[in-house]
Amino acid sequence: LEFVSLIPDSALDFLKRLVETPSPSGFEEANAAHFREYVAPFADRVTTDPMGNVIAAVNPEGSPRVMLAGHIDEIGFLIHYISDDGCCYFRGIGGHDNVVLVGQRVVIHTNQGPVPGVIGKKPIHLLTDEERGKKVDMADLWIDIGATGGREEVLAAGVRVGDPATYEYGYTPLLGDRAAARAFDNRIGAWVVAEALRRVKELNPKAAVFAVATVQEEVGLRGARTSAYGIDPHVGIAVDVTFATDYPSMDKRKVSELSLGKGPTILRGANANRKLADHMIRLAEEKSIPHQLEATPGGTGTDANAMQISRAGMITGLVGVPLRYMHTPGEIISLSDADNAAEWLAVTCASLGSGDDWTP
């Protein structure tokens, strides 16, 4: 991959560790450790709050206070019932498209270690006409770990009610600068804010810059709420994936026209401060950073939503990394979009000063 040479090996290795380490919402500790390890050499301060958010700061006493948020959790499954015949029934952690679940290889993460399994369902050959016409219901699916001795064999393997599970897919390079992985939503956002912090350190910002690996975004933007309250930033910019529309079935009239490889996106709409968005667009044009415009009329389903209304409110922005096939085991991104997002955030943070007025 020609593009990979533009990203330091250590940064690319960090990204691979992030996407290959399972961390569904509520179980983010392993990836929080990766984040802390990566930012430690250049951050002036690294802390972890009671929710599990990792907060890395450069120039923490500076002004204004700027929060960059990228969530490190992912969608997954939670075991809630083990049947007498040894089937592990589950609920979704975050939102799932049930159509893609059947037959997927998964891993249950137990206190005794990982237990592989497969999501099972009644074969199509045995479905009645009525059953074939129904939507796939998660309640009709189960995780099969190969047990033939019923519930006792499953328990002996270490599986318990309350254990999380995730898809068994890691990082896969594709053509050009593209890559596929299970959890680019939103490990790529966490990677971007960490990389932005590393780069802004070299620019000696006047602002206090806080890169936050937020938790539990997929179940209600919970980590962003608490970390934003604690940091009390003047400016908050979230980084998350957004819908690429450069493949079949995507109706640009209903979403936007966004493509892989054409740069990160900047939100325009109620969930973004207009002055900040315009400032970032001007910076991107001056620095020749590829970028795309995205529009949403109301709140978004991202950390930017929680950040904007934290305490008495803050100046908020949202940067997106275009992604194909969101919330599936095979999400695809362009590495150049992520690299450009990190650069964009770094120069943005370096441009901010205590006398700036972003009030609408």
Residues covered by each model-derived region:
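N-terminal hydrophobic/helix-forming segments and targeting peptides
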Residues: 1-360
